[in-house]
């Protein structure tokens, strides 16, 4: 898996972390003060990048959490195969299939030959936008 460690206290809203093995975009971060016993805690809430599920964790602020490494590249739509889209990476010309995006504004603009921006997160791909 392509992740790197990061201290929980350094996580900001809008960044990405791995919660329960799923990459998530952070939507809320709460930090509690240190008490009489114990260290400060961080409560991090994230929305799943691929499934849209809401997840949260509570960890000490000095604990290490996994941050996914996101690779962004341009691909071209080659064909539609059932509920999948076949894409060709424009950097190395390799082809791969991914599920059809759920977002209607992306799905409506897809057609063969169109260039799209793809994010690769932890070995999985997602179309983020259609290039004009």
Swiss-Prot record:
Subcellular location: Cytoplasm
Hypusine PTM positions: 36
GO CC annotations, alphabetized: cytoplasm
GO molecular function: ribosome binding; RNA binding; translation elongation factor activity; translation initiation factor activity
Chief location of this protein within or outside the cell: cytoplasm
Keywords: Cytoplasm, Hypusine, Initiation factor, Protein biosynthesis
Gene3D superfamilies in alphabetical order: 2.30.30.30, Nucleic acid-binding proteins
InterPro entries: IF5A-like, IF5A-like_N, NA-bd_OB-fold, Rib_uL2_dom2, Trans_elong_IF5A_hypusine_site, Transl_elong_IF5A_arc, Transl_elong_IF5A_C, Translation_prot_SH3-like_sf
GO biological process: positive regulation of translational elongation; positive regulation of translational termination
Family: Belongs to the eIF-5A family.
Functional summary from the UniProt entry: Functions by promoting the formation of the first peptide bond.
Name assigned to this protein: Translation initiation factor 5A
Species name: Thermofilum pendens (strain DSM 2475 / Hrk 5)
